[in-house]
């Protein structure tokens, strides 16, 4: 239509023509097929300890000393962050497993000055067997899940492949990468733990946005 009108001397743009047709009720804009975007994160913690996000970060290989790299050593950072207070706890290990995850939780409950009601993680096997059909059908709990049960802590997992549901802890790991791991070299697990403890204190003292 616009091409024919233009050939007849019509001077408006195609967008202008559509606006005129819409006002006259001749052209109805097709409804958008784009789905409403999901929230960037699911923050539901209403009070200290209501929900704590937990995740594991691989310590960058380039941060390991040449000697550690030659030995094939790998280090991991366990991280917990309370959704309401944003208080964060970290612990560094040389393996990530359901055993280490349960050990991390035991340390976490001693660190926080408040009782933890719910812990939320991804679906990794270091936390849960929910993506293992055989284990799930047998209702076989991991050591991590059993530890949470013994401690009276509710357990929640995010949707598979949806890390933004654990957005607060994910973003904290980006800050680790930019401000802690950048241009650092660690010579042992003890070295990493000592410097990581100092960084944890600095992180928890960063100015935060008002709660709410």
Regions inferred by a protein language model and the residue ranges of each:
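Charged, gly/pro-enriched flexible loop segments at helix/strand junctions
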Residues: 15, 197-212
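Generic structural signal for secondary-structure transition and capping sites
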Residues: 26, 153, 181, 205-208
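Short, hydrophobic secondary-structure boundary micro-motifs
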Residues: 29-30, 158, 211-212
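Short, polar/charged, Gly/Pro-enriched helix-capping and turn/loop motifs at alpha-helix termini
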Residues: 31, 115, 119, 206-210
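Basic, flexible linker segments flanking DNA-binding modules
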Residues: 2-61, 123-125, 132-133, 139-145
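RNase H-like DDE/DDD metal-dependent nuclease/strand-transfer catalytic core used by mobile genetic elements
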Residues: 53-77, 85-197, 201
